Amino acid sequence: MIYGVGTDICDIRRIAATLQRRGDRFAERVLGPREIEVFRYRRAKVEARGLSYLATRFSAKEAFSKAIGLGLHQPMSWRSCEILNAPSGQPQIHLHGALADWFAQRRLIAHVSLTDETDYATSFVVVETQGL
């Protein structure tokens, strides 16, 4: 059964401007430990790839927070939710700490879809309850 649905669109140019103003502090605030490694790797290769990665993760976390109905209120936080790719390339949501506990207690599972173009990143998240 569907528990919640969330979507978000992010202007990659705004992410670039924020990074320019605040440096890596913005990325370090939004990304979890494994995400920050991927961000730095992609950004070192091609700046635009790093920006797209950060924007899609920002967008996905916004969409996820909407789908679970908490917004960015505890136990939801930027770093307690990581969007990491499976070996197949499929994005998957990995939760940590109190958010992981909250999610498991409700027997929820999440599905995420990401896409980006030159100026925009969008995300769609469906959260459903697991069958009893």
From Swiss-Prot:
Mg(2+) binds at D8, E62. Keywords: Cytoplasm, Fatty acid biosynthesis, Fatty acid metabolism, Lipid biosynthesis, Lipid metabolism, Magnesium, Metal-binding, Transferase. InterPro entries: 4-PPantetheinyl_Trfase_dom (IPR008278), 4-PPantetheinyl_Trfase_dom_sf (IPR037143), ACPS (IPR002582), Ppantetheine-prot_Trfase_dom (IPR004568). GO terms for molecular function: holo-[acyl-carrier-protein] synthase activity; magnesium ion binding. Its EC number is 2.7.8.7. It is found in: Cytoplasm. Its cofactor is Mg(2+). It comes from the Bacteria. This is Holo-[acyl-carrier-protein] synthase. It comes from Leptothrix cholodnii (strain ATCC 51168 / LMG 8142 / SP-6). The lineage of its organism: Bacteria, Pseudomonadati, Pseudomonadota, Betaproteobacteria, Burkholderiales. The gene is acpS.
